[in-house]
Amino acid sequence: MQPFTSHTGLAVMIDSANIDTDQIIPKQFLSKVTRDGFGVHLFHDWRYLDDAGDVPNPDFTLNKPRYSGASILLAQENFGCGSSREHAPWALADFGLRAIIAPSFADIFYGNSINNGLLPVKLSANEVRQLMDEVASEEGAQITVDLTTCKVISPSGAEFSFTLAESARHKLLNGLDAIGLTLSHGTQIGEYEANIPSWRR
């Protein structure tokens, strides 16, 4: 998993609340169990005018040329609600997004994102609105998300602080998923196992 320390990137926004996981990655695309290849289906029902995904919707934000290559997504409250599917952060990450900034997230989506290297940043509704206004008013507007300082820097230079559980921050800073986190304690695990009495093995 790629470590997340500080990232500066083009920002794009979907100014909607309660974006659920079926909107993020519709159920018909969930048959794969590997993490790659989901980006093309991200927001499928909004991005395309046809079921096959051959006709882009020119009015959808992510299809606008000015947002091509965006790596930071701004959204409204309760992002990632709905059914539990790890494919949602897989699709967002495979599309090229590194961070999602919103006033709130659904709990399961929030945890799944952290476990898959996607940083969910909670800011106040007013702070998210300011970021959206700045991004809308300036083509090519970039936002910096610094996990080392837990700050978001807007295109105009305004700084907003956010919080993240230290365990989650440690995993993201070091690029550790659940398996990687376990392996990072390999020495301690080995010492523990070496001291287990033979009759308990």
Curated annotation (Swiss-Prot):
> What does UniProt give as the signal peptide span?
none
Output the InterPro entries linked to this UniProt entry: 3-IsopropMal_deHydase_ssu (IPR004431), Aconitase/3IPM_dehydase_swvl (IPR015928), AconitaseA/IPMdHydase_ssu_swvl (IPR000573), IPMI_Swivel (IPR033940), LeuD (IPR050075)
Q: Domain of life of the organism in this record?
A: Bacteria
GO terms (BP aspect): L-leucine biosynthetic process
Give a yes or no for keyword Amino-acid biosynthesis in this entry.
yes
Name its pathway: Amino-acid biosynthesis; L-leucine biosynthesis; L-leucine from 3-methyl-2-oxobutanoate: step 2/4
* Cross-referenced Gene3D superfamilies: Aconitase, domain 4
| One Pfam family in the UniProt entry | Aconitase_C
Q: Which reaction does it catalyse?
A: (2R,3S)-3-isopropylmalate = (2S)-2-isopropylmalate
- Gene Ontology cellular component annotations, sorted alphabetically: 3-isopropylmalate dehydratase complex
Task: Please state the Enzyme Commission number of this protein.
Answer: 4.2.1.33
What UniProt keywords are attached to this protein's entry? Answer: Amino-acid biosynthesis, Branched-chain amino acid biosynthesis, Leucine biosynthesis, Lyase
Q: Which SUPFAM superfamilies match?
A: LeuD/IlvD-like
**Could you state a single Gene Ontology molecular function term?**
3-isopropylmalate dehydratase activity
- Subunit structure of this chain's protein: Heterodimer of LeuC and LeuD.
Q: Which NCBIfam families does this entry report, sorted A to Z? A: leuD, PRK01641.1
Protein's job: Catalyzes the isomerization between 2-isopropylmalate and 3-isopropylmalate, via the formation of 2-isopropylmaleate.
Name the family.
Belongs to the LeuD family. LeuD type 1 subfamily.
Output the HAMAP family linked to this UniProt entry: LeuD_type1 (MF_01031)
Official protein name in the record: 3-isopropylmalate dehydratase small subunit
Q: Which organism is it from?
A: Shewanella sp. (strain MR-4)
Q: What is the lineage of its organism?
A: Bacteria, Pseudomonadati, Pseudomonadota, Gammaproteobacteria, Alteromonadales
